[in-house]
Amino acid sequence: PYLEFRLQGDFAVSPKMVDGFVKVKLAKYFNIQAGQFKIPFTFENPQSPLTLEGIEYAQVISKLSGYSDVCHVATYSGGRDVGVMLYGDLFSFKNNGKEIPILTYKLGVFNGNGMNKKDANLGKDIAGSIEICPGVKGLKLAASYYDGNYMLNENDVYDENAERNRLTFGGKYEGKSLVIRSEYITAKTGMGDRNQGEYYILNSDGFYVSAGYWFNYTCKKTGVQHKIRPVARYDFFREDVTEINTNSTYYMVGIDWWPMQNLRLLVNYTLKDKVANDNFGHLLQAQLSVKF
């Protein structure tokens, strides 16, 4: 067994801790992680942004996975929370001499209030995921679940909790060149004011399908190898499944270019089709990243 720790800060606006955790690695099938880190929910949330094709997360990830949640809890937490998690790999097969896990599990208990915040109620939230590789290298099927609650009013009494439950199913394929990923999320969120008799359950859902294909080429003048991939994503979200005016569909296309091993330029164009709006929305984004 051995220890691994990580401490990551953000000084862009005001100093704050982003990641701060310790891993106790005991065996392939059983490990412990404690501190502040990304919750084990969905494919996209635990992944590094440098591996994703979009500058922004899909709507359903943002709204139901601790980024800009429909219940406004853990907003701007980047899918992170404070807690303890067990994780490991069970069973494996070999492909070209490399051992590939068949089943990966993660199960954690969290405060449920986002990063750099103390617990706001007396309960704890549970998040867990299972990923299965069905014998094909690069192919994974997954499901994850979040069972939690939050304070309807942080200034109110402790027993004014509302449910915040989410369930996901997804699959992805990551080959040498082709990358395809899709997830569906369904959620139940308690909303409203119990004191006024206006408490209700908000049912939300959505899914996305994203794809990209890597091309490699070498610059004749410099001899430097470049990596570039066209990317695209179909992104559908229903904040309230009973109200069609909350439906929105985003169509994204872009280019992911690595002119050097530690330099990345990502450009996205998104066409936003919201039922509540008469006109389409247009968003053009560019992001430059440098790895050290």
Language model region names:
Residues 1-115, 122-124, 131-140, 208-221, ...:
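Outer membrane beta-barrel
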Residues 111-116, 153-157:
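Surface-exposed cleft-lining segments at the edges of enzyme active sites
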